[in-house]
Amino acid sequence: MHLIKPSWLSHSGEQKDFEVYSCHVSPDGKRLATAGGDGHVRVWSVEAIFNSHDRNYTKPRQLCHMSHHLGTIHSVRFSPNGRYLASGADDKIICIYHLDSNPPSHTSTFGTNEPPPVENWKTYKRLVGHDNDVQDLAWSPDNSLLVSVGLDSKIVVWSGHTFEKLKTLAVHQSHVKGITFDPANKFFATASDDRTIKIFRYTAPAPNATQHDMVNNFILETSISVPFKHSPLTTYFRRCSWSPDGNHIAAANAVNGPVSSIAIIERTGWDSEINLIGHEAPTEVCMFSPRLFYTQKPDENSNANGAASPGLVTVIASAGQDKTLTIWNTNTSRPVLIVQDIASKSVSDLAWTPDGQTVFAASLDGGVIAAQFETGELGWVAKSEENDKALQKYGGSRKGMGTAEDVDGLHLENHSKEKELRGAESRMGALMGDPGPAQKETATTTNGVKPAGKAADTNGTTTPAPPEKPEEESADKTAERIAELKSRVTITKDGKKRVAPLLVSSSGTGLSSLPQAQLVGASSTKPVQNDNPQTILDLSKPYDGLPRGGIAAMLLGNKRKAVIVEDEEEEEPSAKRSATGPVPIVVNGVEGLEPAPLSAPAHGLVPTPEFLRPAVISPNIAYSQVRLAVPKIRSHILRPLERGVLQEETSLEDATKVPENIVLEAKNPAHIREPARITATKRGALLWQDFLPRAIILVAGSKHFWAAACEDGTLHTWSPAGRRLMNAIMLESQPVILEARDSWLLCVTAVGLCHVYNIKTMSSPHPPVSLAPILDVAMTSLSPHGATPAPGVTSAHLNSSGVIVVTLSNGDGFYYSTSLYAWQRLSESWWAVGSQYWNSNDSSVSALQTTAVGPVSGAKNGEGETNVSAGIIPYLERHTTTEFLLKGRAYTLQRLVKALLARDGFENFESSVSIAHLENRIAGAFALGAREEFRLYLFMYAKRIGAENQKTKVEELLNSLIGGVLRDADDGEGWFSKQDKLCGWDRKDLLQGVVLILGKFRDLHRLTVQYARILDMTLGDEEKETTDEGMEVED
């Protein structure tokens, strides 16, 4: 330990040295503020103090001095963000100072020997609220509150944002001489000459809070008096301190019998059974070090190899009228260090540096002394993450305590802007037809993945990028086509020229800088850069195309005829329907929803399925609340296993032309008394054959099993070799949809029940689920006149986790939550007309995307996990767009929304709906386990709430990502779980990406800089380049 006491570090006068009543160190550890009896607040350079022994050190010692009080200054405190400096004096006034970036206007004070100021600290506010001397001050950890106490026995709470008086607490019966805040931001404690310490519970107020909002805030939690029953009233202060882990309060001027002591109050039950005895006279102040310490030197690789870390302790310094500085820690019952006669008079205040290795002591003899410890003397300083972990059990952390106006904040902002600029250059290069430099600029993304050219695989190999499609439309052609649409002129009957109206969203432009909502048809073949990850759709392949408009549905009581497909409609040739009906935008293909061909269909014979007869309807359907149309009995059904596309009418001979193509063929007899035959062939060779007593309606299969659903409501399964896997499953009615995905099988029956089976485990994740809830919800939005038909089921799929995904003809998309046992709506037309992110072309966060992940069956991502639910959310939103455009409601509803925005009270409608849409996407991606979509939508959401300056949501998002800050004592799930992973991503990686996006918003630096420091994101340019090179080598 080194004691440093420069002769110039004092409040000296012409004839004597004035008392120093208070001292405090700034959060960045660069400034020391002192206050004394000369009525001055002085700001010193900590670096100059540490180098006082160096005669060659020429930098300024005193940075500034302020004399805006009319008497003795008793307390001086920096705000946790370093933005403000508060002082309280015996003139009953509290002064708030802030650092002006402009240089000081004067060189030195006239008539004094004061050195010229280096920094320009100006008076920002003068707070009037006390009737007597102000004895002590304290800021809340999140800077939202400033609390002052004084000799008028009052506790005055001020807003840390507006400095308005929020509340006055008059609960003490004598002078209040100490105040300290809980680092978890839940309580504060005050010490008084009435020989009590009172604990107050509070909720951090909003920046614009007023006195009326604080009526029920700041509630007295408890009052502690046992350790102070016989404490003397001769001390000038009773400065108490709260431990950095939130477990204890150290209270000065306590007694244990006849001996002066320091009382340690435990947070759990507010007990005060522990006393620190080591002073011969009453103590004035005790102060915990802001850092936790290891009792033994920790191993650098302890976290990597899973070894247990050494125990953590807190360190406390105390001093008082015996002129002795005593250092304690929680690991020993005796003091670690005792320094006697450290001053010639009483010690009035203590202040630790942020690193916890130096403590300053202010004395009434007019001097300030620094005790600087070497590494290991007090212990080994733990990382700041340990403070956060210790505070998590109390529902708080050191959030928002970062310095906003320091170099770290500038580094974070520069890093954020650099990443955004690289992404912008990449997108601009792609639009201008110059992808080379753009790919070079964005060779490395934030997570280390290289998306350009070749993508690094997990085993070190490289995978070539897919070739570009030659038929893609360039950006210039797209602009010309849009301009042509805008300038399309029509001539009316009276000869006047009029410009044809164009849907605003189709032009791709907008007045706002925010993403514009666009309803883009899925049939477009141009390479539109959207905000959806380019991944393979994780849904079962709909080989059996559903009728146009989906499977018709009827709910009980709608007074309409039972919906059954008419013979005339089905027997109408497909070519005639294509010529007379509306042009489809998308069609059901082998791999899901595919764009419809823009060119005219080829001439010749159009294959048409041969229907034998309608299926026999089960009598149960007459008593069901939901009734779905049942498919007709077809003469034969072909189901290929490979990716080759085969029409249902293709003969077995044509199917053998597809190499390695395994085909399951079901042949139904013309007579009902004959059995149905089902065969599996490979290259025309028979693999296996089986017979069923009833006609087969639907077939499905994967590489794990085959399945067939029959007219009598039975469901049969076979292994790939043709071995029956289980007895026939008896369904309540005829099947209408049969889908397979990996080991999962979905069967939807005519009464609207969805059955899901895991063939590998021979189990079901949940009982049969009815479609009635989603059809009822859809029906409530129909016209009261009943002119709009009931929505039909356009598709029902399974993902690789066995989750049901259903779309309706009104555009709504749903999935069934196996954890909530309820249907949840993921996509609807409400977002299409109100959100700015619907089919948005804004891809400002596309530089943060990872490369696409391969199919579920074989490909793995970098984390070793399959890409579950990939592409489901974009697929459902494209379906909503398709149905929206087909029904012609887009233009009308967008006009209604624009008219709504012009009304009073709806100014923030579009912004609120857009943010809610992103939250809906994030919730859906998280519930489905869509790893890529979750990360992308999370970054889009962070960028938007940062631009909207929604600090509450930003703080909650950062706390949720860091893990467990908002959870209760019991372990939760999802966001509130104790796991290090969140939707397959490491929480630290997600937090780093969000902090990087939010780094450019200076108003949020109070929240983001602290997280950036934890993640080592506040490095300079040279350090940053070194770190980036290391990341590239690692990747």
From Swiss-Prot:
SUPFAM superfamilies linked: WD40 repeat-like
GO cellular component: chromatin; HIR complex; nucleus
Gene symbol of the encoding locus: hir-1
Name of the protein: Protein hir-1
Species in which this protein is naturally found: Neurospora crassa (strain ATCC 24698 / 74-OR23-1A / CBS 708.71 / DSM 1257 / FGSC 987)
WD repeats: 15-54, 68-107, 129-168, 171-210, 232-275, 299-338, 342-383
Localization per record: Nucleus
Keywords: Chromatin regulator, Nucleus, Repeat, Repressor, Transcription, Transcription regulation, WD repeat
Major localisation: nucleus
